[in-house]
Amino acid sequence: MTKTILVCGHGPGISDAVARQFGAQGFSVALVARSADKLAAAAEALCALGITAKAFPADLGDPAAVTELVARVRDSLGPITVVHWNAYAGGAGDLTTASPAELRASLDVGVIGLVTAVQAALPDLQAQQGAVLVTGGGLSFYDDKIDALAVSWGAMGLAITKAAQHKLVGVLGARLAKDNIYVGEVVVLGSVKGTAFDAGNATIEASRVAARFWELYEARTPRVTQVG
């Protein structure tokens, strides 16, 4: 049976490296983000490598759109074996002034969108004993220095979303274990080269993170690991 990975929040860094890593292992790849043009170019680049890849533009902060997305991917590429969640939303940088809409936007993508995708893909994941793989970040950790960094970087909203997402990985993993569905997270401790967070001093190669995701997928343990 053909295996398909749903790559949510595709961009030039980790998610593209994950698409290449899994595609090289025979997976069909569904690329998801909001920019149709960028997605089409990325899918074309993967196809040039001999990987079956298609672009699926969607708003991952809209639950109805996420549910419809999963159905489109299933109809086009077959049952979903892996959900890779790399999507995030900025905004709500200063929680003393952020609007409720800004706070919701971050959580809608980072938490609610992920839960919705898992719910929609659940029959496929159960049938194939699949996996949910989440890109985490160091801002999720409870630490005075990290909290101070989140404030100074204007990333308070992202920090609380990543913290909620980190807990989500744990509880989803506990809930889905009886269905033999693996849930894992790679927490990235630093900036990844070639991404929006690269200010010229990034030290982490996206391919290294992708390789760790592949290791998690094959070993199905541990629940959380770190790169950086």
Model-predicted segments: where are they?
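Rossmann-fold scaffold of SDR-type NAD(P)-dependent oxidoreductases
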Residues: 8, 80-89, 134, 184
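Conserved glycine-rich cofactor-binding loop
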Residues: 11-12
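Conserved glycine-rich Rossmann-like NAD(P)H-binding loop of the short-chain dehydrogenase/reductase
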Residues: 26-41
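Rossmann-fold cofactor-recognition segment
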Residues: 46-64
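Catalytic Tyr-X3-Lys loop
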Residues: 89, 96-115, 158
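Amphipathic alpha-helical dimer-interface segment in Rossmann-like NAD(P)H-dependent oxidoreductases
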Residues: 109-129
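Catalytic loop of short-chain dehydrogenase/reductase
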Residues: 131-170, 177
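C-terminal helical subdomain
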Residues: 163-228
